[in-house]
Curated annotation (Swiss-Prot):
Residue ranges with Acidic residues bias: 53-64, 94-117
Region (Interaction with NR0B2): 55-121
Cytoplasm is among the record's keywords: yes
UniProt entry tagged with the keyword Nucleus: yes
Principal subcellular localization: nucleus
Alphabetized GO MF terms: transcription corepressor activity
Name of the protein in its database record: EP300-interacting inhibitor of differentiation 1
Gene Ontology biological process terms, A to Z: cell differentiation
Amino acid sequence: MSEMAELSELYEESSDLQMDVMPGEGDLPQMEVGSGSRELSLRPSRNGAQPQLEEEGPMEEEEAQPMAAPEGKRSLASGPNAGEQPGQVAGADFESEDEGEEFDDWEDDYDYPEEEQLSGAGYRVSAALEEADKMFLRTREPALDGGFQMHYEKTPFDQLAFIEELFSLMVVNRLTEELGCDEIIDRE
């Protein structure tokens, strides 16, 4: 538990350090955001002092020196040391892999709803209900239009005929999809 206390102290210290430096007040030159290059812009300081011309492009020293790993430290590409397994974490403070698992236990106990396995009959029933719901949503607007015509324009509207037609379309469409009759109907 002392490791957690040390980590939280380090986090608080780094947060405090970040809060101490406000943008524009540090000694670092301002760069154009999103320019994609390392060109520094000519900007006045916040205090109203004369703008300073900053250098442009990467430093020549950076270009000349290749990136090299510090001597005495191992890189990850060098492979495991003798006696160390390829998957092991090499660290002085990390005693065992079991310590980190206590935080992951809640994932094993949680049941994700999208991972539920439905039985064949239950899946078919839910699929039929979803299809009926989609059909209802698609036909709601014409039904409202039909009701509007019935009440306001005094045109004859047979609600029973409309319901029969709607239900037959739902059933016929569903059966043709399930039985694969789409090709047969299209050929005729």
